């Protein structure tokens, strides 16, 4: 028979939420809809804190914003601090997620930053010409064939892409400034550059070099209870129905990581 001693304090509870992979709405991507149940659960049990383990090269700015906003809202509503621990990378949208935390911790070799916006595509017009293929397009609306990969790139298209990127970039910058505040260095941190480990700390993009378990023990006691929370794979996913989409998502994530030499 077990007896509970009521006056002994319970160990601090810290749910651990892993945010790994590209950010987007594919079956493998990190999305607000997919993560919402886990994020809500993390803040539900009156924890001492919530820990985010981040390993993401980025992705959708909208999903990054929605996920970060949900974390911030619950943190404020429940009065629960959030700590982010960056593993290999928190770049672009991955760093957007990290900034949802009150404090960001990194490894000596973690890559952080890439506070910018990118648009990439391919041009097939020369290949089509060599193969004798003619492109035929009929549109209603002069912008309907905007950035068509089968036509030569137009200066007007480049200008429009930059006009679309600018407000997204400004929103990203505003989020970083709001979350990091006076901790940021006075140099240009918003040119999409990246920094490693202690460099990121020195620039105010992170708060220190630390790993999950020892840092949580230092902050919340040796008996802190770290509770991993993970996404459950659906039946269709387990049966391999989404295999093609999963493979494409993996290729996309590897391409994003390759951009940072990973």
Question: Predicted regions span which residues?
Answer:
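N-terminal organellar transit peptides
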Residues: 1-107, 118-262
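Short glycine/proline-centered loop/turn elements that form peptide/ligand docking sites
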Residues: 111
């Amino acid at each position: 028979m077990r007896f509970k001693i009521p006056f002994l304090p319970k160990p601090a509870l810290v749910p651990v939420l892993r945010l790994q992979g590209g950010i987007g709405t594919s079956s493998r991507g990190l999305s607000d809809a997919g993560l919402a149940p886990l994020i809500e659960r993390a803040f539900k049990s009156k924890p001492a804190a919530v820990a985010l383990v981040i390993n993401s090269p980025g992705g959708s700015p909208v999903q990054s914003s929605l996920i970060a906003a949900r974390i911030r809202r619950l943190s404020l509503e429940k009065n629960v601090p959030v700590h982010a621990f960056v593993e290999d990378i928190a770049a672009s949208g991955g760093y957007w997620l990290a900034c949802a935390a009150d404090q960001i911790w990194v490894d000596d070799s973690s890559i952080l930053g890439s506070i910018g916006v990118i648009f990439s595509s391919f041009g097939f017009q020369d290949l089509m010409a060599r193969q004798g293929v003619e492109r035929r397009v009929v549109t209603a609306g002069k912008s309907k064939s905007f950035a068509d990969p089968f036509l030569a790139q137009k200066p007007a298209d480049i200008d429009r892409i930059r006009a679309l990127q600018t407000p997204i970039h400004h929103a990203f910058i505003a989020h970083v400034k709001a979350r990091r505040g006076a901790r940021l260095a006075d140099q240009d941190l918003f040119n999409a550059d990246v920094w490693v480990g202690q460099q990121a700390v020195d620039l105010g993009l992170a708060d220190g070099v630390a790993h999950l378990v020892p840092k949580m023990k230092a902050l919340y006691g040796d008996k802190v209870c770290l509770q991993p929370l993970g996404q459950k794979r659906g039946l269709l996913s387990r049966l391999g129905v989404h295999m093609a989409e999963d493979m494409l998502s993996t290729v996309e994530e590897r391409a994003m990581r390759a951009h940072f030499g990973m």
